[in-house]
């Protein structure tokens, strides 16, 4: 009676597969006329979370070249106070 335990579940069982999701396409590669400008906070806000963090490229869908440009533009916009450094809900 002392060894009456629930049966252990194996962790190597079949896993549920994620449904296939279409790969996001970099909007800057798709539309060559759209440019990344640090003086345009409206465009940059799309790539910043509400807490003020830069959204990673696996979520935003940017290619690595444009993600680096976005990151630099966001940092420049923060430096000249066009974008807040922290989100609107942050307290210090």
UniProtKB/Swiss-Prot annotation:
Recorded GO MF terms: small ribosomal subunit rRNA binding; structural constituent of ribosome
Gene Ontology, cellular component aspect: cytosolic small ribosomal subunit
Protein's GO biological process: translation
S-adenosyl-L-methionine keyword on record: no
Name of this protein: Small ribosomal subunit protein bS18
Keyword line: Ribonucleoprotein, Ribosomal protein, RNA-binding, rRNA-binding
Ranges for region Disordered: 1-22
The keyword Ion transport belongs to this UniProt entry's keyword annotation: no
Taxonomic classification: Bacteria, Pseudomonadati, Thermodesulfobacteriota, Desulfuromonadia, Geobacterales
Assembly, per entry: Part of the 30S ribosomal subunit. Forms a tight heterodimer with protein bS6.
Function noted in UniProt: Binds as a heterodimer with protein bS6 to the central domain of the 16S rRNA, where it helps stabilize the platform of the 30S subunit.
Protein origin, superkingdom: Bacteria
Organism of this sequence: Citrifermentans bemidjiense (strain ATCC BAA-1014 / DSM 16622 / JCM 12645 / Bem)
Stored Pfam families: Ribosomal_S18
NCBIfam families per record: S18
Disulfide bonds: none
Family the entry assigns: Belongs to the bacterial ribosomal protein bS18 family.
InterPro entries membership: Ribosomal_bS18 (IPR001648), Ribosomal_bS18_CS (IPR018275), Ribosomal_bS18_sf (IPR036870)
Xref: PANTHER family: 30S RIBOSOMAL PROTEIN S18 (PTHR13479), SMALL RIBOSOMAL SUBUNIT PROTEIN BS18M (PTHR13479:SF40)
């Amino acid at each position: 009676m002392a060894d009456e335990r629930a049966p252990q579940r194996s962790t190597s069982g079949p896993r549920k597969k994620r449904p296939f999701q279409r790969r996001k396409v970099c909007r800057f590669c798709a539309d060559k006329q759209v440019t990344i400008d640090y003086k345009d906070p409206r465009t940059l806000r799309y790539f910043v979370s509400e807490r003020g963090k830069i959204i990673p490229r696996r979520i935003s869908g940017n290619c690595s070249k444009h993600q680096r440009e976005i990151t630099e533009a966001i940092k420049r916009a923060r430096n000249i106070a066009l974008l807040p450094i922290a989100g609107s809900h942050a307290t210090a």
